[in-house]
Amino acid sequence: MSSMYHRFHAPHDFKIEQVTFVHGDVWNVNPIALKRVERLFCKNERAVIQTRLASGEALTLVPVAAILVASLRLHFLDLTLNAQSCGPTVFPCDASVRKGDELGWFEHGSTIIVLAPDDFEFCDNVVENARINAGQPLMRKAGTNPL
């Protein structure tokens, strides 16, 4: 049994406005590969999930594919995003999700990049190269409770 959790969840209540699938490579995303492959996250296949918080602020999630991860599933889209898809492809979306809802999963596992507004900050327990656990708070808007 793998120690990795390959599913990902909504970090907050939000509306999903659009998903852009960007076709690319499937390099490994381990620390060694990150040092060797320049702009690796910009080269690998990825899905740019554009969302809007109730406050009106944008929050973007970018699940990035990796070696052995040739497909990505999103519950709110009735399709599999994978190497057979041509990209970039834009999928308009109008799905509302609640904090903790499962958004999708990787067939094997990978990385998710979070692009948040400037007034968001990491929680104190988030440190470089540390393992993140499902349900662990990652970010918060300055002066508020964690996402």
What does each model-identified segment do?
Residues 1-147:
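Contiguous, well-folded functional domains in the mature portion of proteins
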